[in-house]
Amino acid sequence: MSYKLTLLGTGSSGGVPRLGNNWGACDPANPKNRRRRCSALVERISGRGRTLMLIDTPPDIRNQLLDAGVETIDGVVYTHDHADHTHGIDDLRRLAFNMKRRVDVYMDEPTRISLETRFSYCFRMAPHSTYPAVLNSLAIDAPQPLTINGAGGPITAIPIPQMHGDAGSLGFRIGDVAYCPDVGGLAPESVELLRGLDVWIVDALRYISHPAHFSVGQALKWIETLKPKRAILTHLHIDLDYAALQRELPPHVVPAFDGLQITWA
């Protein structure tokens, strides 16, 4: 039995390049600078098959799942309701049709209210519509663990409450790997949930400060505090060139890029 996490997207809300072919400080010749919006795929692999857990459905999710060869999914978890993490939700329809059943999606209460309002037809068949609802809404009660079952065996994730500007968001810990995009602060209780990590994938939006996201400097300070064995910086804006950022980081910290994979037992 083993686990694999694939970073399907590692960019900030506008991606890299931004519309208008704006690469900022990023070198267009380096494919690791082309970043779709943030999402991750967690797989548990055993002799019986695979269990797949998707984290977020950004606007790029269709191409991300095509690139990853994903045809079915056992469950989707949401970090929060912002557009760059949710507005590909309708593409779950195709997965539901492939599986001939609804897709289970896990959300905290603010995200549930938001998505069931904005995308109500995904959860409830609209009057006079011929399109069936395709999603089951399941509650996240952080920090209570949630479990997604599939052919490869159960994936258990601990939701970690995060500060994200005026709103909140969730990170997720699976074993000794944690995925924490869109974080601007951590309460003491959440800090305790992030100790003893082998790998921490963490938000590092820009060099300069931002009210809702860690900067590179803030992320490095938190890495120094929590002491994961390795760390990966994600949710990267156009001012963070991959090669330039890599040169500045300590040996156990690397920038993320779309398609990066980590495995563990």
Feature map (PLM): residue ranges:
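Binuclear metal-dependent hydrolase catalytic cores
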Residues: 1-180, 184, 189, 246-265
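Binuclear metal-ion centers of metallo-dependent hydrolases, dominated by the metallo-beta-lactamase
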Residues: 143, 187-265
